[in-house]
Amino acid sequence: MAERSTDFRPGLPSQRQVVELLDGEFARAGYDIEDVVIDAATRPPRIVVIADGDRGLDLDAVAELSRLASEQLDTLDTPPYVLEVTSPGVDRPLTEEKHYRRAQGRLAEVTLADGSTLTGRIGAVQNATVALVVREARSNLTVRDIALDAVVKAVVQVEFSPPSPRELELAGVSGKET
């Protein structure tokens, strides 16, 4: 994580301090800290903790993580601030194996090192390879195994209609919600 603070404000914790303070509590709750943004330019300043987990981040999880973060941050002597705990959002690039695992069953646009772009449904991830269910013809679905180190960029796409049961089955998520 790159240190991102829009302004210096004496007494506010650094990004590193926030991560060190919260990482253990979030991990025990089953979540990872993806990023911390400290915006000292706003009044009051904002501390934004971006978290994700294998179960996703629903409202109950956000409330629990906010409570945990608030308890930990309250141990510091800081000026007043606004705490926000949020998920990375759908437009976050998939950059780590865990991101692909969490996005299994979702549609993604994947740009490869050779310059080609594929759109497909994310399947199982194992041994640094992701299975991508691609539609090669109007109704012909194929599973392509793609090495994660061959991926330059991958972003989950917003969908407006449900995928076919066969597509979900090939992605390894039949019977699950995506």
UniProtKB/Swiss-Prot annotation:
Biological process annotations from GO: ribosomal small subunit assembly; translation
Keywords: Cytoplasm, Ribosome biogenesis
Membrane spanning stretches: none
A GO CC term attached to the entry: cytosol
Main location: cytoplasm
Family label: Belongs to the RimP family.
Role noted for this protein: Required for maturation of 30S ribosomal subunits.
Protein name (Swiss-Prot/TrEMBL): Ribosome maturation factor RimP
